[in-house]
């Protein structure tokens, strides 16, 4: 899914997040997405990479390419303002159509500032535990940091060993959101003469 389409979907999702959340037994974690009823989350005591359990997100009914579920949290950006933040984790998959870790940074009004859903390096199929990271800048107007793991379509995904840490600018950002650097420096075709 292209970043722009995903951003719009997540922006719409943010507005109705509370209405669409499915109750779960994993403290601090929410199950949401385009079709949360097609998915389940739990703490898995049998499959884990570090410690004694992992987070699990799986499709419980057939799900199609455009449908996704996400196991997520939201926290304040206050302690991260002005910093480059790295979220790292370990992910394992089974028959996953498409999945990955994700992180989104929003303003107080819910406008997107920074975003990465690993769409350009999505995980597919069955994989053993692998290390993944997302690096985003928490600019001064940031208010909320959303993060988690998403599963597009069917399959299963486990996440473990999630760590947030500050990194310096030598660590490249993975931001997929449109930036001003991609915009033209001046308006174009104002007379509509060019085709």
Residue ranges of each PLM-predicted region?
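Extracellular and organelle-lumenal recognition/adhesion modules and their flexible linkers in secreted
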Residues: 2-195
């Amino acid at each position: 899914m292209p970043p722009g389409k995903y951003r719009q979907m997540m922006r719409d999702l943010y507005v109705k997040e509370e209405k669409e959340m499915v109750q779960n037994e994993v403290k601090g974690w929410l199950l949401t997405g385009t079709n949360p009823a097609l998915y389940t989350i739990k703490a898995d005591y049998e499959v884990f990479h570090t410690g004694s359990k992992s987070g699990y997100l799986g499709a419980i009914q057939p799900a199609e390419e455009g449908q996704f579920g996400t196991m997520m949290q939201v926290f304040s950006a206050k302690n991260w303002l002005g910093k480059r933040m790295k979220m790292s984790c370990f992910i394992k998959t089974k028959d996953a159509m498409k999945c990955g870790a994700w992180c989104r940074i929003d303003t107080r009004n819910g406008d997107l500032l920074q975003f990465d859903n690993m769409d350009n390096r999505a995980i597919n199929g069955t994989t053993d535990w692998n290390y993944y990271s997302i690096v985003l800048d928490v600019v001064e107007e940031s208010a909320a940091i959303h993060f988690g793991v998403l599963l597009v379509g069917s399959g299963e995904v486990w996440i473990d060993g999630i760590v947030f840490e500050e990194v310096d600018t030598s660590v490249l950002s993975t931001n997929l959101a449109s930036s001003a650097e991609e915009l033209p420096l001046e308006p174009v075709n104002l007379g509509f003469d060019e085709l």
